[in-house]
Amino acid sequence: MNQQPKYRIYATLLDAFGAYLNSDVIWDKYWGWSENPPHTPEEFHEQQFQELIDRINRKPFDSEAADKGTAFNEVIDCMVENRKSETVQVEKIYKVIREGACDETGKPLYYDEVQTNEVIGLKATYNNRVFTFPISLCREFSGYFKGALTQQRVEAIIPTAYGNVLVYGVIDELMPASVHDIKTTGSYTVGKFKDHHQHLVYPYALMK
């Protein structure tokens, strides 16, 4: 049987296609209640279509949120693999103690800042942007993913009526019995990522 793919589709491209198909539902979820939405449903539909085309054409885009996710992911991978990063500049942030004196009203007269040896965070510089992450969060993630295989590319063929389709993607953390995609988000609600395709594509590819 000929397994040469006629099409190649990555997981986030499927997400963009889904967002285009469901643009009315998405618009109603975020702006249906608003008296002054940033765009009409028709404008949002066209915006989602353009984002899909840009994804297909691999058009570069600049996103602080995406850069933050990339930086955090690399920090965790470096801690899991006990290595230095070649793409993200990582520096330790140390706890600073202020020592000084106040007058009888409590107004500070002077103070000195003394840097301790206690690490409280990591500063990650990526794509000319600087992000800080609490060390407790980084240790929690890296401890959970200890022993994981990081950034594993997977792919598989799906036979369809239109020809063989190669679906592929990169798993952030591959554990012996589970697959993990690390997300950073400004706000989270249960099920926020349930319609994304990573959790469908990655297990399917691993089983093939």
Name each model-derived stretch.
Residues M1-I171:
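Metal-dependent nuclease catalytic cores that hydrolyze phosphodiester bonds in DNA/RNA
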Residues G147-K208:
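Mg2+/Mn2+-dependent nuclease catalytic core
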